[in-house]
Amino acid sequence: GMVMQDFALIEEYTVQENLLVPLIFGKVKKREQSKKIMDVLEKVNIAELKDKRVNQLSGGQKQRVAIARALINSPEYILADEPTGALDSNTSDDIMDVFEELNKNGHTVIIVTHDNGVAARCQRVIEIKDGEVLSE
């Protein structure tokens, strides 16, 4: 799953419709789709927004929809580009808790960040500048 820094959501779709797209491509059975959507929305604390259009959401809410979309098919690998950039500190902590739980359950989570607080919560940090590895 991929979390884009600019969210890459379909603005005219509802939250639920945005999450349905990867389920359809992932060939998830129709009867399982609603449950998967609600489960992932609850995980990122935005279940109440499922019927809202994305263009009506705040930046932090869009960020959580983008994270939910990346997680919806339970991918083995998750690449998250600045996944907490649009979030307040409490929500950022909650999302990092989700990533840590996924990691404990065998998922590989790669986070690209400029936030030292986020980096401090990672198991392994690689510092890169101008394409060169500065430290590991």
Model regions: which residues?
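Hydrophobic anchor residue at the start of the ABC signature
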Residues: 67
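Catalytic "switch" loops of ABC-type ATPases
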Residues: 5-10, 24, 115
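Conserved ABC ATPase signature
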Residues: 53-57, 61
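Catalytic Walker B motif of ABC-type/P-loop ATPase nucleotide-binding domains
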Residues: 78-81
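Short coil-to-helix segment of the ABC ATPase nucleotide-binding domain corresponding to the Q-loop/switch region
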Residues: 13-20
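ABC nucleotide-binding domain "signature" region
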Residues: 32-44
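Conserved signature/switch motifs of ABC ATPase nucleotide-binding domains
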Residues: 52, 73, 105
